[in-house]
Amino acid sequence: MKQRYAMGYLCFFLIIPLMAGDDNMARKANYQLAGRFAPYKIKKLLYSTSINPKWIEGTENFWYEWETSEGKTFYVVDPIRGKKEQIFDNDKIAAELTRISLDPWDAQHLPIEKIKFIDKNTLQFDVKSSQDDKGEEVIEEEIDEQKWDLDKKEKEKEKEKIYKKKVFHFEYKINTQKLRELKDWEAPDKHPKWANVSPDGETIVFARNHNLYMINASDYKKILDAGRGKDGKKAVDAIEKVTVNERQLTRDGEEYYSYAVFDRGDTDDKRKRDKGKRKRTRIYWAKDSKKFASIRSDQRKSKDLWVVHSVKNKRPKLETYKYDMAGDKNVTQYEIDIHDLATQSILNLDIKKFKDQRIGVYSGRQFRYPDSDKPQQTVWLAEDSKKFYFYRQSRDMHKVDVCVADTETGDVKVLFEEKLNTYVELQRLELLKSGDMLWWSERDGWGHIYHYGKNGKLKQQITSGPFSVRRIMGIDESKQTIYFMANGREENEDPYLQHLYSVFIDGTRMKLLNEGNFDHRTSMGESNRFFVNNYSLVNTLPKSALYNTSGKKMADLQEADLSQLMAAGFQYPEPFQVKSADGVTDIYGVMTKPFDFDPQKKYPIVAYVYPGPQTEAV
């Protein structure tokens, strides 16, 4: 399958027609017609085309918003009952919001923002008023970067004071349709980007001046309280003023051999101004919060690259950063340290094998609820802090070792390896409760799932055949079932179309879960019991439906509203299939004809190919 992907997917565009009978006389290009379908114009004619389900924690339910030419509507879905219902009576809620906010709203233009479910029947949301809130502090617009060279007096002139718009906070009960203004509303926690919070919430790690530091939960609460309800520079300034007890964890960090994550896009001037401030760092927590691993990059011998920022600046600003290129003798070197919080010790793992190797750490699968105020955490792939899984990859990307490290002794063991004469493509490692592992590989020419024992010995190939598994979507160990996306398996279909499948861990009972000659994109809930299926082709109306993971359709949910687009004269592209130059290989593509296409005329063709692989490596 790799060869098929490398050839890419073709898009053919028919452009300026040639008059029949005279190939040398081209008709004038119809730019006006093409301009009608410029992206910024199409955007105004398109509404919702797929459902992005917001799963509600503690339930199987989810909610979503859907926009048509009639306006925006909000729905909540109960997958167990296979029922969807409108959250609001749009006319009624518009009238109530008008009464409270004194701004005129109607059913087609609801101002509802930032919906957050508290439980399956209770949600909160915001409505922004048209009026300034004179009781709030004003926002001082951040000074553009090019203005930092001005003197203090000139800087003050550059500041613009802008009042915040008043925001109303509401709570709504779905079962009773009761709306209540939350006059005592308090802003939720807003976690700074630099904060790496442990799974138990007791330790927060960050970088400062290239080294690692930590604070405890009580000090972190002071920081959250200081930044509560504030945005941008005001939040940063308020947080910086809080006095907390920082404990330094490392002392050997330096520029280009740092524990901090280098922020691309920062100019040299901004980097100087931010020196000494808290920074993000790349760490992975153990699930029990006793240890964490840090990834450190040594770029001291790597060469510089430069970008000049000139679009937003009156004067160009320079950004200097390290960048490895093909053929460079000295490139970035990586190392992994294990930090023990109880003993304050650091264990440097001996991970060296391939010259100029790359490394990656395997993290555990986590389900993120959109309404959660919890900080995002990266937890390493293990049930405790005793083991640590990672991979190392040769510079030419032809060899990969999947390894496990003992975090007490530092011993590193190769569990299994991948070798190919072409590049080895990687996906996540899945760890079962037994300690066994699921691994995705293209070793037989197709992407498939393999089952390894905890000792690294291959037990069996789970999926096989002339099709490609794209990715594992979920694992239900209680049912010994894997859910995955794949393409190329169904006969008489474009092999690029994706479907959702299930298979037992022992390789039996593989089942297609969303039939239909369409490209399917799915979103599964945390329990792996239900999924939303968005499906279409380039020449069909996008639709969405609810399924259970036995493959039963529970409900049709939505069809996209393309009425305005079609009324403007839009026409679907046309899929096609042809043989390549070898006369054997099938090529699949899409042809887009001019909207005033005349079959009696001749048209030159523009062939657009997007070849692979899409990867950046040296």
Regions from the PLM with identified roles:
Residues 1-9:
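Bacterial N-terminal signal peptides that target proteins for export
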Residues 9-12, 26, 581:
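Residues at the start of alpha-helices and the adjacent loop-to-helix junctions
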Residues 12-20:
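Hydrophobic h-region of N-terminal signal peptides that target proteins for export
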Residues 20-542, 546-547, 563, 570:
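Beta-propeller folds
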Residues 53, 304, 519-618:
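Serine-hydrolase catalytic core recognition
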